[in-house]
């Protein structure tokens, strides 16, 4: 007994469903009998079909800088009026919306003009919604790959302006007129609409502005009806954190190592050149990585590339400086003569200006033990040669100091033994050689000090050049910001 009411209800439901289906089928036959999807929905040939357009961005997939290609995922909302599809829901069981395949209805054939892969149309032919009163809505999804001219001047602190240009493929400006859609509040949606709930944020790019504009042009024919383009500008700003962590910070640290070459001794020119050249090679690797990322263009040089070239120039100058300092430090008095002016500037003036400590003074040697005077040695020699007692020789020496000479003493000096003369000559030679070696050592030490002074000067010059140059290069990126355009942000906070 309990199953009977249940069966009756099920039968009534099926009958009701069948009646509803018949009404929809009847509406379909009513609308599409003698309907031609190839003709425009106008009563007169000179009438214009008004197309309301709305573009909703769901995902900014990527921007390939190398190929200058922007890949986006969008929904294209298209609304228009077709008087041939006009009906009243009261005549067809209260049906407000009829869904029909898109190939059965006239379409404005909107395509993306600046696509790069030849896919002008949409990705999926969704059904067309026909509403009471002849209003038609088509909302197909599409994945577009469009051309985007990449400006690499401030890479990786750059922003790009990529455009999506829509137009009707077969209809001119007199046959089809484009307008922007309006929201529920009656405001015109003259920008790319972004649904924050469905939008997937890109990890590399942030969208700042996405205004739209409708432009009518003649396409080269001044007397023709012209064409209408709907241009959406997608102004995106790069998020530079990835490049700062993986390229800029390692590059700055490696470039700073070239300054450590100045902390090596001036005579270690080979080691200093090795350090500088290794840094130069590392910078070349970073420059190669950047060249693989940016497009092959000669219009501008990227900011990071300018920084690497600048640091490579500094490293090259440091290598040249190391060679010059090594050449100066290895000079000797036999090959080069030091001018007094150069000595004054590099050894006296510049150390005082740079605050360098003066060279340490050589410790004074302790006074040697008192030796016998040369007069005593001569007296002993005369005593042996002349066979005279020491008292007489001393007396003759006193007379010599008083200005009187004896012929015997002069004859004794003339007849001095050859052995004594050889010893005196040897002593004089040793003394003269010692004086020459001391003078040569002092001059060699002056050349080494001059090399150290040049090294010190070049260190401060390289430090100032590296710091100021790097700051000026990256300071340009700070001022490269998206201009304050008179548009509302795409993504409202």
From Swiss-Prot:
SUPFAM superfamilies reported in the protein's UniProt record: Neurotransmitter-gated ion-channel transmembrane pore, Nicotinic receptor ligand binding domain-like
Disulfide bond sites: 148-162
Biological process according to GO: acetylcholine receptor signaling pathway; chemical synaptic transmission; membrane depolarization; monoatomic ion transmembrane transport; muscle contraction; signal transduction; synaptic transmission, cholinergic
Effect of residue 265 to L: In CMS4C; prolongs burst open duration 2-fold by slowing the rate of channel closing
Region forming the signal peptide: 1-20
Protein's membrane topology: Multi-pass membrane protein
Side Extracellular, residues: 21-239, 292-306, 481-493
InterPro entries cross-referenced by the UniProt entry: Neur_chan_lig-bd, Neur_chan_lig-bd_sf, Neur_channel, Neuro-gated_channel_TM_sf, Neuro_actylchol_rec, Neurotrans-gated_channel_TM, Neurotransmitter_ion_chnl_CS, Nicotinic_acetylcholine_rcpt
Listed GO CC annotations: acetylcholine-gated channel complex; neuromuscular junction; neuron projection; plasma membrane; postsynaptic membrane; synapse
Subcellular location: Postsynaptic cell membrane; Cell membrane
Keyword set, alphabetical order: Cell membrane, Congenital myasthenic syndrome, Disease variant, Disulfide bond, Glycoprotein, Ion channel, Ion transport, Ligand-gated ion channel, Membrane, Postsynaptic cell membrane, Receptor, Signal, Synapse, Transmembrane, Transmembrane helix, Transport
Glycosylation sites: 86, 161
Impact upon substituting residue 141 to L: In CMS4B; marked decrease in rate of AChR channel opening; reduction in frequency of open channel state and resistance to desensitization by ACh
Pfam families xref list: Neur_chan_LBD, Neur_chan_memb
Molecular function, one GO term: transmitter-gated monoatomic ion channel activity involved in regulation of postsynaptic membrane potential
Keyword Transport belongs to the record: yes
Catalytic reaction annotation: K(+)(in) = K(+)(out); Na(+)(in) = Na(+)(out)
Transmembrane domains' residue ranges: 240-264, 273-291, 307-328, 457-480
Effect recorded for residue 75 to R: In CMS4B; strongly reduces agonist affinity and gating efficiency
Cytoplasmic side: 265-272, 329-456
Function: After binding acetylcholine, the AChR responds by an extensive change in conformation that affects all subunits and leads to opening of an ion-conducting channel across the plasma membrane.
Disease the record associates with this protein: The muscle AChR is the major target antigen in the autoimmune disease myasthenia gravis. Myasthenia gravis is characterized by sporadic muscular fatigability and weakness, occurring chiefly in muscles innervated by cranial nerves, and characteristically improved by cholinesterase-inhibiting drugs. Myasthenic syndrome, congenital, 4A, slow-channel: A form of congenital myasthenic syndrome, a group of disorders characterized by failure of neuromuscular transmission, including pre-synaptic, synaptic, and post-synaptic disorders that are not of autoimmune origin. Clinical features are easy fatigability and muscle weakness affecting the axial and limb muscles (with hypotonia in early-onset forms), the ocular muscles (leading to ptosis and ophthalmoplegia), and the facial and bulbar musculature (affecting sucking and swallowing, and leading to dysphonia).
Subunit structure: Pentamer of two alpha chains, and one each of the beta, delta, and gamma (in immature muscle) or epsilon (in mature muscle) chains. The muscle heteropentamer composed of alpha-1, beta-1, delta, epsilon subunits interacts with the alpha-conotoxin ImII.
Family affiliation: Belongs to the ligand-gated ion channel (TC 1.A.9) family. Acetylcholine receptor (TC 1.A.9.1) subfamily. Epsilon/CHRNE sub-subfamily.
Name under which the protein is recorded: Acetylcholine receptor subunit epsilon
């Amino acid at each position: 007994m309990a199953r009977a009411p249940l069966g009756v209800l099920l039968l009534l439901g099926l009958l009701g469903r069948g009646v509803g289906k018949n009404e929809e089928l009847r509406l379909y036959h009513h609308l599409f009998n003698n309907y031609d999807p190839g003709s425009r929905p106008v009563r007169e040939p000179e009438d214009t079909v008004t197309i309301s357009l709305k573009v909703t961005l769901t995902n900014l997939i990527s921007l390939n800088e190398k190929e200058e290609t922007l890949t986006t995922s969008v929904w294209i909302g298209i609304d228009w009026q077709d008087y041939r599809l006009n009906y009243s829901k009261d005549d067809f069981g209260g049906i407000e919306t009829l869904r029909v395949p898109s190939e059965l209805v006239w379409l404005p054939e909107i395509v993306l003009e600046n696509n790069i892969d030849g896919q002008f149309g949409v990705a999926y032919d969704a059904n067309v919604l026909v509403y009471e009163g002849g209003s038609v809505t088509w909302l197909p999804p599409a994945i577009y790959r469009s051309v985007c001219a990449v400006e690499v001047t401030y890479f990786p602190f750059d922003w790009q302006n990529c455009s999506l240009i829509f137009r009707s493929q077969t209809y001119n400006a007199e046959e089809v007129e484009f307008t922007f859609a309006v929201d529920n509040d009656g405001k015109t949606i003259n920008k790319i609409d972004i649904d924050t709930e469905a939008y997937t944020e890109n990890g590399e790019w942030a969208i700042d502005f996405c205004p739209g504009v409708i432009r009518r042009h003649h396409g080269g024919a001044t007397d023709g009806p012209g064409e209408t383009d709907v241009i959406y500008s997608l102004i995106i700003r790069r998020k530079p954190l990835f490049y700062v962590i993986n390229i800029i910070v390692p590059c700055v640290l490696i470039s700073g190592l070239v300054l450590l070459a100045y902390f090596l001794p001036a005579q270690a020119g080979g080691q200093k050149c090795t350090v500088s050249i290794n840094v130069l090679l590392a910078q070349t690797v970073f420059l190669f990585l950047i060249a693989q990322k940016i497009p092959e263009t000669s219009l501008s040089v990227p900011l990071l590339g300018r920084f690497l070239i600048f640091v490579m120039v500094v490293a090259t100058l440091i290598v040249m400086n190391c060679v010059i300092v090594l050449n100066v430090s290895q000079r000797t008095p036999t090959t080069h003569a030091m001018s007094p002016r150069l000595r004054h500037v590099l050894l006296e003036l510049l150390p005082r200006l740079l605050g360098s400590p003066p060279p340490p003074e050589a410790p004074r040697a302790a006074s040697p033990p008192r030796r016998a005077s040369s007069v005593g040695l001569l007296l002993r020699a005369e005593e042996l040669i002349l066979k005279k007692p020491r008292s007489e020789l001393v007396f003759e020496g006193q007379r010599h100091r008083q200005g009187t000479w004896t012929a015997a003493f002069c004859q004794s000096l003339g007849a001095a033994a050859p052995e004594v003369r050889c010893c005196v000559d040897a002593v004089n030679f040793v003394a003269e050689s010692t004086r020459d070696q001391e003078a040569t050592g002092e001059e060699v030490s002056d050349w080494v000090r001059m090399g150290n002074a040049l090294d010190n000067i070049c260190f401060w010059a390289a430090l100032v050049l590296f710091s100021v140059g790097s700051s000026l290069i990256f300071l340009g990126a700070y001022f490269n910001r998206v201009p304050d355009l008179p548009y509302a942000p795409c993504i409202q906070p």
